[in-house]
Amino acid sequence: MNKIKDSFLIQDLETLSGIKAHTIRIWEKRYNLLSPERLNRNIRKYSLADLQKLLNVSILYCNGYKISKLSLLSDEELHETARKISLESVQSNYNVNTLIFAMYTFDGDQFDKVYNELSESMGFEEMFVKVYIPLMDHIGVLWQTDAIKPAHEHFISNLIIGKIVLNTAEISSVTSEDATIYVLYLPVGELHSLGLLFLNYCLKKRGKKTVYLGGGIPFSNLETLNTKFPSIKWICSFVVERTREEKEAFLFEYVDFLKKSDSSSLIVGRVMEEVSGKEEFKERITFFNSFKELPFFE
């Protein structure tokens, strides 16, 4: 079983906070900013408390506060000042940092606290775009640098998914004159459903009729829907990297499927960028690198 990460090297702090390791070391020596445990002459081990403090310091430092002043504040004062900055500036990453810390400590209550505070000043769609997307982007970096375990990513992703489902359920049914049914699915091999779930929420919020299928859906299953609905707009997303040959094989098969039903599709995912220019695909498929590029958000 993987041990939950509760201690960090200075390289971990650099990755998580965006503050260079050299700068962190200078702040330690000059201002006694952090209190690491010294393992030997050159290696220091930092605690979760050190991480939380540095995350708050990084927010305030990036907002113009002098490190000499910040070093004089208590941990509680740093936390409260960073929180106030977040309320004054939508661009502040205070909430992202708070959620990263909640992820490390598996603190669902802290996640809900941030959600409830944000809900007082913005809608869920704005919250997702301004907080959850930057959070997941940052988590992607942490994953690539081996700074987090799968348990961390699964924990925070499932909390966000829970909020998407909650907000989707609260949308009142709207009778739309548009007969198009938007069918959202993940192809076989794709398991990252968070973005697609959010898109389903956004479509419903805009009065669109949707069918959300989730992940691992083969073409044979999709054909069943053609017998149920006369007008379908298919939407799928890709995150998992594939070879060029695998991408083209999927798209050729997909285009044949779309032609049979005289339908079209939107595909979201930067991984398809290298093959998206082929004329054979453009007739039936429109490609987007990210969900934010979709026409629903114009």
Give the location of each predicted region.
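Polyanion-binding surface elements
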Residues: 3-23
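Short, contiguous strand/loop micro-motifs
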Residues: 11, 44, 86, 185-187, ...
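C-terminal regulatory/effector modules of DNA-binding transcriptional regulators
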Residues: 147-149, 155-298
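Long amphipathic alpha-helical segments
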Residues: 16, 20-25, 29-172
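Short, amphipathic alpha-helical "recognition" segments used to contact nucleic acids or chromatin
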Residues: 1-5, 57-58
